[in-house]
Curated annotation (Swiss-Prot):
Gene name per UniProt: nuoB
Keywords recorded for this protein, A-Z: 4Fe-4S, Cell inner membrane, Cell membrane, Iron, Iron-sulfur, Membrane, Metal-binding, NAD, Quinone, Translocase, Transport, Ubiquinone
Protein name: NADH-quinone oxidoreductase subunit B
Entry's Gene Ontology BP terms: aerobic respiration; electron transport coupled proton transport
EC number: 7.1.1.-
Stored Gene3D superfamilies: 3.40.50.12280
PANTHER family according to UniProt: NADH DEHYDROGENASE, NADH DEHYDROGENASE [UBIQUINONE] IRON-SULFUR PROTEIN 7, MITOCHONDRIAL
Amino acid sequence: MIVPPNSAAPSSSLVPAGSAARSTVQGYDPKLHDPYFDGLSGQLADKGFVTAAADDLITWARTGSLMWMTFGLACCAVEMMHSAMPRYDLERYGFAPRASPRQSDVMIVAGTLTNKMAPALRKVYDQMPEPRYVISMGSCANGGGYYYYSYSVVRGCDRIVPIDIYVPGCPPTAEALVYGVLQLQKKIRRTGTIER
């Protein structure tokens, strides 16, 4: 950009921190902005340290380091895999995959749950340490979906394990799952207990 000698060049230092300049940051979405972190960052900027209860600190740490285990049963599992790939990248929200239920905090049930698979789902859920959370992904996992009247389908995985977040769709998009994960993080922050 060529600036005439008599005019002032636009300066980003004239914009106060945290105002309109924030919207120009790549990847910032005001809909996903959390006022909880505004309070912490304001307190940190004023004093140089943060005072909080141990429960608040543990809850804050838990929301940023959730380990999820896949329980992909049908076509929804493909969209679940998309959400972990570079385009959506769930790990940037502190949501990393694990292969074992013993190291997982969250289980994503994606797809049609059959009667034969229901005991395995419950067994895997019981192996997860407390506090544990479950996301039901897709119409089939939520309520039976297209196969509702089949003799071999469980009409919703909430009959087997308690569900925290329902992600609707057939199949739901990867964006819907990312939104469900963000809602789970907000729910954990809101309830904020060490034991569930």
